[in-house]
């Protein structure tokens, strides 16, 4: 599968979000997602915060689903993230890892590898889980 055949995401209780083939709705988003992922890596490499770019990436990723509820839930997550993120001890390497994992999401989707996409999405959340664990232990 490639960007030409694109992705939508279904819900599976055992796998979380899972990619499934659909129309070519992501073709028009590939360049934007790639640019956002690159910008996140650049910001993280400079030790700068990329939360707004991260937010834009996730909203752009979900747009082709055509599901307003998913977009609203994604936006709600980012409102919570904006409140919680400053209270977490985020290490500079966490930011870079997160940014690189956004790039991995784009690369896996572009390559048409559903397993790599599932893995990239799951791996993407590891740094935030680590930050939350640090905050809870403090």
From Swiss-Prot:
Source organism per entry reads Micromonospora viridifaciens
Q: Which Gene Ontology molecular-function terms are recorded?
A: DNA binding
Protein name, entry field: Putative transcriptional regulatory protein NedR
Q: Which InterPro entries match?
A: GntR_C, TF_FadR/GntR_C
What role is this protein assigned? May serve as a transcriptional regulator.
List, as start-end ranges, the regions of compositional bias called Polar residues: 9-25
Q: Which parts form a coiled-coil structure per UniProt?
A: none
Region: Disordered; residue ranges are: 1-25
The alphabetical list of record keywords is: DNA-binding, Transcription, Transcription regulation
């Amino acid at each position: 599968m490639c960007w030409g055949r694109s992705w939508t995401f279904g819900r599976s209780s055992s796998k979380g979000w899972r990619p499934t083939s659909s129309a070519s709705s992501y073709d028009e988003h590939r360049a934007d997602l790639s640019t956002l992922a690159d910008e996140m890596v650049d910001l993280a490499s400079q030790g700068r915060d990329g939360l707004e770019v991260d937010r834009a990436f996730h909203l752009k990723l979900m747009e082709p689903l055509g599901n307003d509820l998913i977009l609203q839930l994604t936006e709600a997550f980012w409102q919570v993230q904006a409140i919680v993120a400053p209270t977490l001890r985020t290490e500079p390497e966490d930011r870079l890892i997160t940014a690189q994992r956004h790039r991995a999401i784009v690369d896996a989707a572009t390559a048409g590898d559903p397993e790599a996409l599932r893995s990239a999405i799951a791996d993407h959340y590891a740094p935030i889980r680590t930050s939350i664990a640090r905050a809870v232990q403090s």
